[in-house]
């Protein structure tokens, strides 16, 4: 029978393969963030992801468990991870050709407000954060839980860069959207 950690690994591998294939459908960017901006959020997200996903020996005491191992706890994390990845995929499908792995605007870029974008302005980040919380619960290590705020910081840096760019491009329309829809967590 498959164990929770194996299920988590499968979820992330399937998501990554699909995400890479979907990237081939993105339109060409006409405005793109600076290399420095990409570097800052990229390093934070990568460092946090290594802590959440990794089991490297150099992490030493950070690999200690946080709570007693129970199968139901691991499977709860798997469910959260699957839900988060599904939400991120739904958002990626909804944004379609306007998606970019970097902070960018596409030719004829439209402000997407439907589907998951009616729930949160950055549903891909929301979904990925939920998936990482689920992964940390399943991994059950201090390193995994310490990695979560590091990933959040990286995504927050990118979110702020995107917000500035979208505000410049869409002006009052984006201001209205910002007033109506939360950035990451619904109802907050």
What are these regions (language model features)?
Residues 109-120, 124-125, 167:
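Solvent-exposed interhelical
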Residues 1-106, 113, 131-188:
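Membrane-anchoring alpha-helices and their flanking helix-loop junctions
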């Amino acid at each position: 029978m498959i164990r929770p950690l194996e299920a988590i690994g499968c979820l992330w591998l399937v998501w990554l393969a699909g995400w890479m294939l979907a990237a081939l459908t993105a339109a060409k960017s006409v405005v793109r963030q600076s290399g420095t901006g990409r570097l800052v959020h990229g390093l934070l997200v990568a460092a946090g992801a290594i802590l959440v996903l990794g089991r490297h020996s150099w992490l030493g005491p950070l690999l200690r468990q946080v709570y007693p191992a129970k199968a139901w706890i691991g499977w709860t994390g798997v469910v959260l991870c699957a839900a988060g990845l599904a939400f991120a995929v739904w958002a990626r499908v909804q944004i379609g050709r306007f998606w970019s792995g970097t902070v960018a605007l596409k030719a004829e870029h439209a402000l997407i407000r439907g589907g998951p974008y009616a729930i949160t302005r950055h549903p891909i980040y929301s979904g990925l954060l939920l998936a990482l919380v689920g992964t940390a619960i399943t991994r059950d290590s201090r390193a995994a839980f310490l990695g979560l705020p590091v990933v959040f910081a990286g995504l927050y840096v990118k979110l702020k860069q995107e917000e500035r760019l979208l505000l410049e491009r869409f002006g009052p329309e984006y201001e209205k959207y910002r007033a109506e829809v939360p950035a990451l967590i619904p109802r907050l």
